[in-house]
């Protein structure tokens, strides 16, 4: 059996009734991964041995009937630490790095009985929006293998969309969960900053990074967030979890809910078919009883510029630790200490990572700090204030997740600015530390279109409520790419 069309709750019932074992489900999942891997390249490491050991232990202990995730396989983005499983951040720099600890999010998932089946491919050090900067080769879109899957959580999204796994973890610094979720037609949530511990996440932009869940449906996404969210003394930016159950509002109607539609999110640079899809979605929300009104987020247009100064500056600092001395790649042609540093970093990092390190170092350098980094911080505050003004009167914000559907592989690699602009609609959410979700809302040119819902801090349950109401009255989430295959 493949089980790839079974929901988490259906799988849980099969496990509790002992119609299948955790080992059988894990073996089937591993076969799903292997059978699709040549077409997608969505995994860096398939952790077969470790997964089967975990599954056997769960079978021996018995499935927890009160825990819907007990015995359920999970794929983890390759920048999230996993004890005893290679964690490379898809970089030559960390080609041989095997952590001796689990990230808190992974540890939380394991505590719930989840089984880590592998580490998913990604843009190197989470720097990229197409899944093409990986040292291990580009990931392919689940719907069309000549298209990008989005990034940086490319493998995590493609793996869920293709039926390799039901659930996966990604990280989102400027849209890296939501954009690949949109491009692959699944549900991806970037939680409020601090909701999921960053301990064990290989840092890119520390004021922006957040771990979050991928799933085929809204409820399954919320169930995974339930498992991984926690306050953590090991992460000074983590916050108390204010919601006992993120599924609590799923199934409730949205009559009277006020939803804002920013005019800037449907302006210049938005594909006409994407715009039409989002406007149709807005009408659908109105049919469900919500009140949808146009608003303005005037400083959102500066989001990309602000982000690439702040994120690159934080990256240039965070990546200083990779020097060829302590762990990771060390150049063999170095004859002195300076050459070890220079050659190891030059050879170990890919072009996009080096570009961002240089941009960040420049922004922080003497004479340019005030003009760039300090100014970016000031404009970031204006972006936050724009959101606060809107959320004083509205429950949620609605818009497209990305300006277009997935584009051709290798079409923007030589135009980094064009690729950066693809994050135009997701970046402001990270700058403000807000929660945002992408859900399937239609198709254009045979490819999925993602709808983004944004809420004020700690409003994930309201986001899930609205997303689930849309999902329950549409069938976009039920449509699957050819590679998904049948179920038996």
From Swiss-Prot:
Its EC number is 6.3.5.7. Pfam families: Amidase. It catalyses: L-glutamyl-tRNA(Gln) + L-glutamine + ATP + H2O = L-glutaminyl-tRNA(Gln) + L-glutamate + ADP + phosphate + H(+). Keywords: ATP-binding, Ligase, Nucleotide-binding, Protein biosynthesis. PROSITE patterns: AMIDASES. The active site is at 77 (charge relay system), 152 (charge relay system), 176 (acyl-ester intermediate). InterPro entries: Amidase (IPR000120), Amidase_CS (IPR020556), Amidase_dom (IPR023631), AS_sf (IPR036928), GatA (IPR004412). One of its GO terms (cellular component) is glutamyl-tRNA(Gln) amidotransferase complex. GO terms for molecular function: ATP binding; glutaminyl-tRNA synthase (glutamine-hydrolyzing) activity. Transmembrane segments: none annotated. It is an enzyme of class 6 (ligase). One of its GO terms (biological process) is translation. Belongs to the amidase family. GatA subfamily. Heterotrimer of A, B and C subunits. Allows the formation of correctly charged Gln-tRNA(Gln) through the transamidation of misacylated Glu-tRNA(Gln) in organisms which lack glutaminyl-tRNA synthetase. The reaction takes place in the presence of glutamine and ATP through an activated gamma-phospho-Glu-tRNA(Gln). This is Glutamyl-tRNA(Gln) amidotransferase subunit A. The gene is gatA.
């Amino acid at each position: 059996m493949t089980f790839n069309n079974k929901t988490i709750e259906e799988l849980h019932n099969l496990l509790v009734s002992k119609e299948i074992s955790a080992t059988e489900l894990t073996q089937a999942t591993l076969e799903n991964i292997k059978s699709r891997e040549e077409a997608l390249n969505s995994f860096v490491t398939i952790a077969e041995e470790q997964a089967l050991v975990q599954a056997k232990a769960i079978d021996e202990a018995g499935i927890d009937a009160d825990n819907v995730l007990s015995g359920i396989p999970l794929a983890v983005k390759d920048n999230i630490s996993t004890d005893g499983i290679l964690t490379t951040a898809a970089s030559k720099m960390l080609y041989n790095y095997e952590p001796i600890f689990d990230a808190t999010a992974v540890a939380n998932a394991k505590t719930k009985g989840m089984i880590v089946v592998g580490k998913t491919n990604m843009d190197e050090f989470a720097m990229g929006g197409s899944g093409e900067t990986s040292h291990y080769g580009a990931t392919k879109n689940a719907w069309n293998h000549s298209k990008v899957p989005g990034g940086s959580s490319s493998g995590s999204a493609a793996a869920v969309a293709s039926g390799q796994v039901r659930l996966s973890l990604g990280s989102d610094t400027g849209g890296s969960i939501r954009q690949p979720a949109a491009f692959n037609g699944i549900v991806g949530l970037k939680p409020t900053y601090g909701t999921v511990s960053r301990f064990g996440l290989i840092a890119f932009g520390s004021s922006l990074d957040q771990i979050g869940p991928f799933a085929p449906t809204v409820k399954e996404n919320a169930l995974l967030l339930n498992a991984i969210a926690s306050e953590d003394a090991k992460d000074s930016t983590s916050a108390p979890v204010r919601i006992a159950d993120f599924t609590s509002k799923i199934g409730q109607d949205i009559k009277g809910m006020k939803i804002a539609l920013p005019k800037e999110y449907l302006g210049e640079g938005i594909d006409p078919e994407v715009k039409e899809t989002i406007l149709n979605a807005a009408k659908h929300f109105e049919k469900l009883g919500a009140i949808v009104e146009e608003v303005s987020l005037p400083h959102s247009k500066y989001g990309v510029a602000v982000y690439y100064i702040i994120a690159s500056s934080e990256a240039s600092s965070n990546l200083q630790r990779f020097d060829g001395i302590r762990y990771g790649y060390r150049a063999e042609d170095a004859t002195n200490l300076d050459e070890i540093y220079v050659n190891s970093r030059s050879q170990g990092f890919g072009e996009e990572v080096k570009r961002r390190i240089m941009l960040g170092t420049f922004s922080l350098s003497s004479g340019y700090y005030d003009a760039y980094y300090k100014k970016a911080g000031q404009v970031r505050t204006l972006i936050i204030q724009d959101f606060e003004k809107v959320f004083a009167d509205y429950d949620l914000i609605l818009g497209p997740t990305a300006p277009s559907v997935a584009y051709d592989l290798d079409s923007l690699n030589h135009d980094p600015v064009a690729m950066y602009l693809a994050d135009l609609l997701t970046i402001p959410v990270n700058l403000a530390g807000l929660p945002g979700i992408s859900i399937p809302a239609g198709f254009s040119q045979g490819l999925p279109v993602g709808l983004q819902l944004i809420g004020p801090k700690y409003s994930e349950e309201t986001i899930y409520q609205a997303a689930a109401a849309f999902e329950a009255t549409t069938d976009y989430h039920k449509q699957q790419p050819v590679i998904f295959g049948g179920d038996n």
